[in-house]
Amino acid sequence: STLLLRALSEYDSVTALSFDYGQKHRVELQRAQSLIDYLASKGHNVTYKQIKLDGLVDLLNSSLVQGGDDVPEGHYEQDNMKETVVPNRNKMFASITQAVALSKANATQEQVDICLGIHAGDHAVYPDCRQEFRDADDAAFRIGNWEAERVGYFTPYLDTDKLGILQDGLVLCDELNIDFDDVYKRTNTSYKPYPSGNSDYKSASSVERIEAFIALGRPDPVQYEDETGPVSYEVAKASVEKVLAEYSA
C-alpha cells in the first residue's frame, strides 16, 4: 500500500494489480478495493484489476491457501515458516505483471515501469524474494519477449526496512493530502485473519508488522482479534513484545 502511494507521487498514470489465488487471507483483496475507493474519493485515481487464479487452490500445497495446514505462529526466522511458502508464487505474479506492462508499453509506445515493494526485510525463507531469483526472472523476461527493453522497474524500498517504509508512508500521506490511519486501516498483513476480517497478531507477518509500528511509535490502525474476540492494539503490542524478547534471548 505504501508502494501504491509512492507510485502516485512519482507517476502520472498508475495501474494496480491484485491476485486471487485461493489465499486464506483473501480479506487483502477487499482491503485493496477499499483503499482504491478511498484514494479515488481524495482525487487520486488508480486503474485497479483483480486477477483471478483461484482455480489453483486445489493444486497448491501451502499453509497459506485454503485447504492447507494451519498457518504457523511465531517469528519469521523460525524453521516452521517454510510452511508459508506458496510454490512459485512470485514467479506467477511476475510473469503476469510483465505481460501486462509490456502490453501497455507496446500499445502506448511508451516506457512502462513495474513497481515492486521489494524491501530489506524480505526473508530468506522465501527463495523467490532473493536477488538471484529476481535477476534470473528478469533475464528470462527479456530473452523471451520482443521490445522488453520498454519495461523497467521501480524499487524504492530495496534498501529499506518496514519501519522505513512506514516512515515514507507518513511523508506520502502528507504530500497526497490523505490520512495515514485511513490508509493503513485499509491494509492487511495477517496470514491468519479471522472470519470478521480482523487481523491476528501471532502469525509471523502480523508480528513483523506490529514490530514496525512499535518502532514507529504509533498505534497500528487495523483491528486485531484473538480467540476471545476483538482486542486493542495494546494487547497485540504486548504479545509481540513478548515474542521478540523470547526470540532475542
What is the predicted function of each stretch?
Residues S1-F180, S206:
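ATP-dependent adenylation/nucleotidyltransferase module used to activate substrates
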Residues Q109, I114, T187-T189, R218-D226:
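Charge-dense, low-complexity polyampholytic segments
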Residues R134, L166, Y184-T187, D200-S203, ...:
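Short amphipathic alpha-helical surface patches that serve as generic macromolecular interface elements
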Residues L244-A249:
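Short flanking/linker segments adjacent to small metal-binding domains or redox-active Cys/His motifs
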